[in-house]
């Protein structure tokens, strides 16, 4: 369709520069905290659950799976309505937290997640031939 804006998952997303502090930061390891430019962003518990779930998935997730996971005891239509409501409430912030397509969701690529950083560091340390890989594997 001509003139249609490209969706985020249809474009190549560049990794954030490491020398610049990210505007949006999500901390999960020591409890849920979302901050924008070092100021805490309050979210309702349902918004926190969605953001944490998407952060841990670290990929595009079908809307139906999100709804079913976050509201497992609700009928499918009610769970889908709950998800739409949470997305609408999250959408009122100036910084987009969730990227959406017609059928899928993911955490916005602009959100720095502590779990992702920890995973990258662990993978770096355990990389075959890396300086710490042998010591870590041998328990030294």
Q: PLM ranges: what are they?
A:
Residues 84-87, 91-95:
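C-terminal flanking helix
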Residues 71-81:
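Short, positively charged loop/turn segments that connect secondary-structure elements
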Residues 39-70, 90:
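Short amphipathic alpha-helical recognition elements used for nucleic-acid or partner binding
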Residues 104, 121-140:
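Short acidic-capped amphipathic helix/loop micro-motif used as an active-site/signal-coupling element
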Residues 1-46, 96-106, 111:
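Short boundary/linker motifs that mark transitions into or out of structured domains
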């Amino acid at each position: 369709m001509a003139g249609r804006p490209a969706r985020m998952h249809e474009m190549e997303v560049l990794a954030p520069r490491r020398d610049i502090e990210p505007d949006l930061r999500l901390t999960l390891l020591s409890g849920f905290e979302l901050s924008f430019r070092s100021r805490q962003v309050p979210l309702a518990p349902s918004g926190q659950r969605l953001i944490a779930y998407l952060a841990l998935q670290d990929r595009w997730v079908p809307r139906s799976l999100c709804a079913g996971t976050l509201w497992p005891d609700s009928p499918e239509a009610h769970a889908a309505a709950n998800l739409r409501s949470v997305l609408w409430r999250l959408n009122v912030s100036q910084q987009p937290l969730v990227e959406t397509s017609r059928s899928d969701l993911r955490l916005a690529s602009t959100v720095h997640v502590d779990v992702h950083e920890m995973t990258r560091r662990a993978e770096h340390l355990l990389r075959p031939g890396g300086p710490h890989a042998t010591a870590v594997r041998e328990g030294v």
